[in-house]
Curated annotation (Swiss-Prot):
Compartment annotation: Cytoplasm; Nucleus
UniProt keyword annotations, A-Z: Cytoplasm, Hydrolase, Nucleus
Domain of life: Eukaryota
Gene (name only): RMS3
Protein name: Strigolactone esterase RMS3
GO BP term, pick one: strigolactone biosynthetic process
Reported consequences of knocking out the gene: Reduced plant height and extensive vegetative branching from both basal and aerial nodes.
One term of GO molecular function: hydrolase activity
A Pfam family hit: Abhydrolase_6
Protein species of origin: Pisum sativum
Cellular component, GO, one term: nucleus
InterPro entries reported in the protein's UniProt record: AB_hydrolase_1 (IPR000073), AB_hydrolase_fold (IPR029058)
Amino acid sequence: MGTPILDAFNVRVEGSGDKYLVFAHGFGTDQSAWQRVLPYFTRSYKVILYDLVCAGSVNPDHFDFRRYTTLDAYVDDLLNILDSLHVTRCAYVGHSISAMTGMLASIRRPELFSKLILIGASPRFLNDGENYHGGFEQGEIEHVFSAMEANYEAWVNGFAPLAVGADVPTAVREFSRTLFNMRPDISLFVSRTVFNSDLRGILGLVNVPCCIMQTARDMSVPASVATYMKEHIGGKSTVQWLDTEGHLPHLSAPSYLAHQLEIALSQ
């Protein structure tokens, strides 16, 4: 699109509406994850899509292992993209890692975001005693890292159907494709960054209205995490319980998710 950051992250703006809507994908996918959700919004919004630096669709030379040790660098990328497009106000839909990135960005620049819609969001994946159930023990996480390191292909083949959750073979194939597109060392590095992060302390600083979308069964994010986030986010927040399974409803139930997004955006 003419500037280095927009070209580097394959930024696209689709649609003809007056307002901006950002779709930011999560770990293991790229912007194509939104392809069956996108058509529902191009009449009402200018929709901004981009690829995270870790996506297989981005030149891996852009991934600086020293810089991307925390989500702050992903926040920098998001804000630089919006500034390059001269966006002054937008609604934001973030999945997984990008849900938390959106929250961090809203703390830095609250005036930029009218609403955050957070899909499969978690501020902390590890359990913390009796006070917080993130879904994983440290040993389980280390086992995941070891499996990724030992045989990435085998790990993807096992992980993709578990993450999708629902019995939707096309979604499993699509998620597997984008996982395989990632360079394995980058995939492992990002996994370590995400699973070892603890962003519970920033929730109270988020004052932009939030809608937390939580599926019926998500192997990565227990339902209790959605409730925890609602209770700790500083501003107005709601939980929208989705009548579908898995961590990737935009792949497994795109038309249903699009309808739920329309409801959230209208409120």
